[in-house]
């Protein structure tokens, strides 16, 4: 996703669409595990990926990765390192993000596990309840 005002090969004149937080969108849509990491700390990314895969239910993991060929080069980030430095400047651990004033949060993205609901009913389990209710000609009880 290209941030508003930046340009790439597919957004030659710059992105005019508002930047939005995909993790907030997915969390609001009902995902029971939502996380974000960056390529800057591969070990942390790996640990979070394992958590996402082990989580029972819908998991979403957003990874901020450098795109030095298109996004970086076209937006005055002359190297892969410069692109990673930009990613580092807009991301910070959720615990630190939560301590910021609202005005300081604009343009920043928290990293780590952002939502984890271990008690959420997993979709396939819910569907089994629908099938059982259909078989018994009753209303589904969730």
Predicted features by range, described:
Residues 1, 14, 57, 110-114:
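Glycine-centered flexibility motif
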Residues 1-6, 42, 49-54, 72-85, ...:
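Short, surface-exposed, charged loop/turn segments at secondary-structure junctions
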Residues 67-142:
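Flexible, low-complexity linker and terminal segments
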Residues 27-38, 53-56, 60-72:
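Active-site rim beta-loop-alpha module in soluble metabolic enzymes
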Residues 4-51:
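Conserved thiamine diphosphate
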